Amino acid sequence: MQRIHKVILYYVSLTILYRVTYLFDLEEPWSTLRPYTPYLFILAFGSYLGITLLYNVATTNDKPEAYVDLVKDIKEAQDALRSKGMTIED
């Protein structure tokens, strides 16, 4: 299955699940939150991605092999740009 098919399948599944919740009569605290659930899911997912990204950036120094690979890639990119006539400050 191609990636677009998976994305469409997840989107349709979540939409159906969200719409099915309107078939049930929920108690007061949940019925007031129901219209905002998509935004809450987006907020929670964004928070997860942000925290994961910040954690991985903060712990890069704990992985010396990743640091060496990153420095090597930067040097290769600088050499490639210099070979094309671009001046780069170190």
UniProtKB/Swiss-Prot annotation:
One of its GO terms (cellular component) is endoplasmic reticulum membrane. Disulfide bonds: none annotated. GO terms for molecular function: protein-membrane adaptor activity. The chain crosses the membrane at residues 7-26, 36-58. Signal peptide: none annotated. Its main location: endoplasmic reticulum. It holds the Pfam family DPM3. It comes from the Eukaryota. The keyword Oxidoreductase does not apply. Keywords: Endoplasmic reticulum, Membrane, Transmembrane, Transmembrane helix. InterPro entries: DPM3. The keyword Transmembrane applies. One of its GO terms (biological process) is GPI anchor biosynthetic process. It is a multi-pass membrane protein. It is found in: Endoplasmic reticulum membrane. Composed of three subunits; dpm1, dpm2 and dpm3. Stabilizer subunit of the dolichol-phosphate-mannose synthase complex. PANTHER family: DOLICHOL-PHOSPHATE MANNOSYLTRANSFERASE SUBUNIT 3 (PTHR16433:SF0). Belongs to the DPM3 family. This is Dolichol-phosphate mannosyltransferase subunit 3. The gene is dpm3.
